[in-house]
A protein has these predicted regions:
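Conserved RNA-binding domains used in RNP assembly and mRNA/RNA metabolism
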Residues: 2-86
């Protein structure tokens, strides 16, 4: 089965500088945007997760490795790199 390959840009949770900070001096540096590319598995298909965009790094004969489950609220964009064909 051919799978759709996607490029997902999403906002990751992140920490501020290490150590003690003066809260009054803290500056918001915006979102940390991450790029993920892989095989899209849509919910409710096996290997997916509800309310998430699920992207697998590698698929082979029904097995997969390195699934990334990205909460839909964190997704900023998604581009289909190759539409599936039969």
């Amino acid at each position: 089965m051919k799978r759709t390959v996607v490029w997902v840009k999403w906002a990751d949770a992140h920490t501020s500088e290490s150590g003690w900070l003066d809260i009054d001096q803290y500056e918001d540096d915006g979102e940390t945007i991450v790029d993920t590319v892989g095989f899209l598995i849509s919910y409710p298909d096996d290997g997916s997760k509800k309310d998430h965009i699920t992207v697998w790094q590698t698929l082979c004969d029904g097995d997969g490795i390195h699934a990334m489950h990205i909460p839909v609220g964190m997704v900023r964009s998604m581009v289909v790199l190759n539409p599936p064909s039969n």
